[in-house]
Regions:
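Thiol/disulfide oxidoreductase modules built on the thioredoxin-like
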Residues: 106-111, 118-163
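N-terminal targeting signals for export/organelle localization
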Residues: 1-38
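Structural microenvironment flanking redox-active thiols in thiol-disulfide oxidoreductases
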Residues: 68-108, 118-124
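Hydrophobic beta-strand anchors of alpha/beta hydrolase catalytic cores
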Residues: 56-57, 88, 135
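Short extracytoplasmic/periplasmic juxtamembrane "stem" segments immediately C-terminal to an N-terminal membrane anchor
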Residues: 33-51
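Short active-site neighborhood of thiol/selenol oxidoreductases, capturing the structured segment around
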Residues: 47-65, 74
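Active-site acidic short loop of glycosyltransferases
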Residues: 51-53, 83, 111
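Short loop/turn microsegments at loop-to-beta-strand junctions
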Residues: 32-33, 54-55, 132-133
């Protein structure tokens, strides 16, 4: 049987186009999960109450080199924009341990909210996060404006935030 390459390519292109339109949210941006969590200091956070200002949720781990490399940049971003209402929530993955998380917070002067996702509920709520760092920038309207697996482009994030604030 002879393969018709043009036919296969056409079918593949149609399948990709259909999958894109079927999976894409209707307004182009997916709503952020309506999750509740508690910081490692016992402060409750309800993401639905953060509407009106942008915030970032960063899934990280103490044993993740890329995550540790991002900490000074996140700290600087929070220092620059926190007074305008911007918030960072760093979510430590289930394999981490509270003592290690607290030690890193002190050593790296992490001045933003830190949550321990002990049972993986938050990772599931954000689409099954398994890789760190994975970051979500949420718009003031509660939509996911940026989702990034791997280290962030801080210039891009800063510009997006300045446009939102």
């Amino acid at each position: 049987m002879k393969l018709d390459i043009k036919g296969i390519l056409l079918l593949a292109a149609i399948a990709v186009a259909l999958a894109f339109f079927w999976l894409a949210p209707s307004d182009g941006l997916q709503a952020a999960p309506k999750a509740k969590m508690t910081t490692i200091d016992g402060e409750p956070i309800d993401l639905t109450e953060l509407r009106g200002k942008p915030y970032m949720v960063v899934f990280w781990a103490t044993d993740c080199p890329g995550c540790v490399k991002e900490i000074p940049h996140l700290r600087s971003l929070y220092n620059d924009l926190g007074k305008q209402g911007f918030r960072i929530i760093a979510v430590a993955m289930p394999h981490d341990e509270i003592p290690l998380i607290k030690t890193m917070r002190e050593e790296k002067a992490m001045n933003y909210d830190i949550v321990f996702d002990e049972d993986g509920t938050l990772a599931k709520a954000f689409g099954g996060v398994k890789v760190t760092p994975t970051s979500f920038l949420i718009s003031p309207e509660g939509k996911i404006a940026l989702q990034k697996m791997g280290e962030l482009d801080m210039d891009q994030v800063t510009q997006m935030l300045r446009d939102m604030l």
